[in-house]
Amino acid sequence: MSSIHEVVALIEELYSPHPKHDVNQIQQSLQSIQKSEQGFHLANELLSDDKYSANVKYFGALTLTVQLNTRGENDYETLWNVFRSNLLYLTKFSTLYVSNPNMYGQSLIIIKKLMSNLSLIFTKINDPQLNNAGNENMIKQWNNPINTFIQLMSVQNQNINADQLLLDSINCSLTYEQLSQFVSLSQKHNELALTFTEVIVEDLTKFQTKRHSMSQIHEVVHEHLYISTMALINLNLTAQAVFNPTVFDCITAWINYISLTRSVSSSGRMDLSEIFQNLIDLMYQSTEGSDGYENAEKILTIFGNVFANDPLLMSYDLRQQIECIFLGVVRPDSGITDISNKNSWMLQYMNYLVTNDFFSELKELAICIVDFLQINTLSVCNKLFTNIQAADNGQVQDEYIQEYIKVLLQMTNFPLTPVLQEFFSVRMVDFWLDLSDAYTNLASETLRPNSIELSTQIFQQLINIYLPKISLSVKQRIIEEEGESTSVNEFEDFRNAVSDLAQSLWSILGNDNLTNVLIDGMGQMPAASDETLIIKDTDVLFRIETMCFVLNTILVDMTLSESPWIKNIVDANKFFNQNVISVFQTGFQTSASTKVSQILKLDFVRTSTTLIGTLAGYFKQEPFQLNPYVEALFQGLHTCTNFTSKNEQEKISNDKLEVMVIKTVSTLCETCREELTPYLMHFISFLNTVIMPDSNVSHFTRTKLVRSIGYVVQCQVSNGPEEQAKYILQLTNLLSGSIEHCLASSVQLQEQQDYINCLLYCISELATSLIQPTEIIENDALLQRLSEFQSFWSSDPLQIRSKIMCTIDKVLDNSIYCKNSAFVEIGCLIVGKGLNLPDGEPYFLKYNMSEVMNFVLRHVPNCELATCLPYFVYLLEKLISEFRKELTPQEFDFMFEKILLVYYDAYIINDPDLLQMTIGFVNNVLDVKPGLAIGSKHWTSFILPQFLKLIPSREKFTIVAVAKFWTKLINNKKYNQEELTTVRQQVSSIGGDLVYQIMYGLFHTQRSDLNSYTDLLRALVAKFPIEAREWLVAVLPQICNNPAGHEKFINKLLITRGSRAAGNVILQWWLDCTTLPNYQG
């Protein structure tokens, strides 16, 4: 070992703010010394010499920890030596500390480390698994470290180096008087005793998660340390002298320990009732004048921890007292007196927090009280609405209930700004949600006679309280005072939680007492004072926006198109529709010159557009109401497209507005197709404007608008297919013409490429919107003219299909676009749009098999195979699925040769993605029509031998795909008898090779890929049980040398007959042969 001076120098350098050498090297050097045989002696040297600094002495205590963990586990002599030293030095430094805390204040960190060491020793000594060996003189149990500590501190003037004195103190007994006398010596004596017991249970709480069993340790704690500590804590809580706040940390540690151990300890319940009662009494004594409510705040933190994590630690009687303090009401039969004084303390405390703007402390109080209320929401529910807890005196009971309701609502309606200043209303949302759920689940026979009236009264008041609480005026104030802080996010969460609460309350209040009330509140008076529909009174604007926000949540899950009720209530509120539009218009016209105005502008538009979209079903009943909404929405879009500001934030805001509006337009068009027919030409005219490349509109809006128009075009059925085709032709000419005009430019910059890609997506969106939204049988108008539509679109007299194909060909014939996967993807998407639609459905974009094949053959040779080929192959998969009845093996061969086989050796085999794609293509054929592949001339000459070689691949996706191929080949329910016979013969002929490749791949694979091989092997054993034995017997010796394991494996595997149990057998063989442990075992 280095000299003591060198070690001390290293320690001082380690703890210095600017060490000269590498800290890691210093740590490694010191750690090697700590773990060595000289470590114990080093610790004693560092702790015994008074000239060393606190850092050096702390390192000495830390060295005892290292010795304890490295050498004290199995060596009793080391354990005893470390135990002895810890007791000696704890007594030494504690004596110095209590004698002069100012001079020896730095010793406290050393004292706590020594206490932590003794805590670990306490655990080791009392663990029978650790001390079951050793000599007879070995200490088998250490009952009470607090008694030991007090005893040693009491005999400090004697020679405590004497081992006998130490041994006598280890399990000594102390009377209550001795304990009381010790803690009364000084505040520091008291503080050290509290700290020691706190350290012990904190460590025990940590150890509980690491050790399998600590039942005996818990028993020792329960019978000894618990009793002393409860006496110690209660002495502190009831002391008339100077109060020591350390007791609160000690109580918290013990609560956490008891909460953790009461479910695992067999020693019975460690009761905390006396402590809780003393805490309640002490809380009353904490006032503004006495300690500025400092103790009250700490006690409420303790209670909050109990209520949130383990409320049953507190007895029912104590919880009734707390209820009296928090709410000022108690059950008539509780026996609690002095109710008003108890609650007045809480009101004074709240007033103190509010008056002094202690909003953080007020938030903690709110959390504590609401956590208390949520301990047993069902009990509160029973109090209010059932006869289960009714008192004998009905009048007294009614008065109690009314008072209880009043307090709950007052707490919810706390008179400050939510989130920013008060948190009661925020946290109470969870309570009311739980209460409403509990109420809806009550058995009807238990309800009080007036429960329906009472619940309506409570929950309607609740809605009235929360509406102004979630107003955007609150959000405005938060942003003005704190900017875009976490408080804004908290407010948004609060607002959404209240809307969820309203949705939950609807099941109790229904339309009559909730939905209709909101609509009445919005529709009785005009919010805007002139024809511009701009709401100038901000209070009115905020109020109506809030009701719109909540109303949307309630309406969103209703089928309004089938609800006559909505028509009647809106008719009775003639300003409802106008006021919804006014919120939208006001939002759009709001200046966005400041951050807060930008945010609120978006909120107003978001709320109104969301509600307009939700009302789409209502407009099906009242189509004449659509006109002002459509005008407002397109006026909003027009405003967005004419946006000219260079301010980046304003541009971002404008883009968001545009997205909100076009989404709502799309929702209306999808739901109200027939009702919007009169606006169709207006929509197309607007599209003509925004489709131009110089239009200030996003690609998203262009594609959404085309889809929206397509919805309306789709329902143009009553006048025959010619009328529908007229609109489709007009739209395709517009889109195709714009694409071709752009392609004609000699330079294709990124801007032009993005524009063409957008227009292709517009064609795709148009094609999607023209697909029937329901089955044909549900569309009477189409059903009456079905044959007419089928004939028209089959012949396509306007040549719409060929025009669209021509446009796509022109794009992909371009040398830039043909190698860009984005254009290939959208091209294939459009061409395949009409594939796999229901039989007999007339559709304008159904290409036949030769047209699709010609498209693929035309563009594959020029594309970037690595990125583009998968889209063409996916299109072929759809083609095979669509024309599976007509396709022959010869046509499959043609596809396979021209699209895959020709590129296999040069490209596909070297690209895992393309390889997976190729195998997947064949798998798809086996799914759709297996005869196409099995009858192919390439089946036995290429597909089977190539896919056989791929089984032991190292690429995960290749393994998955090829295993799926062979599994599907072996076990396919879509074979006819001839195909089944052919496949069995083919598998039988290559069975040996197949099993070799499977077992070779299985043996060399990683564990995560075992399932693919397992599924394949299970299928083989299930379908070829007899042959499988022969194949395995022949193959396994070639894989690895484990004859006994192979025989066992074969026997077990065949017994499973391919069931799921085979998985465990295969796994065990793999583990045995790769010499890995089975961690599942």
From Swiss-Prot:
Principal place of residence: nucleus
Domain of life: Eukaryota
GO biological process: nuclear export; protein import into nucleus; regulation of cell size
Coiled-coil region list: none
Entry's Gene Ontology molecular function annotations: nuclear export signal receptor activity; nuclear import signal receptor activity
Keywords annotated in UniProt: Nucleus, Transport
Gene3D superfamilies: Leucine-rich Repeat Variant (1.25.10.10)
Record family assignment: Belongs to the importin beta family.
Miscellaneous information on this protein: Present with 9760 molecules/cell in log phase SD medium.
Function per UniProt: Nuclear transport factor (karyopherin) involved in protein transport between the cytoplasm and nucleoplasm. Required for the nuclear import of the complex composed the large subunit (TOA1) and the small subunit (TOA2) of the general transcription factor IIA (TFIIA). Required for the nuclear import of the RNR2-RNR4 heterodimer, also called beta-beta' subunit, which corresponds to the small subunit of the ribonucleotide reductase (RNR). May play a role in regulation of pleiotropic drug resistance.
Identification of the protein by name: Importin beta-like protein KAP122
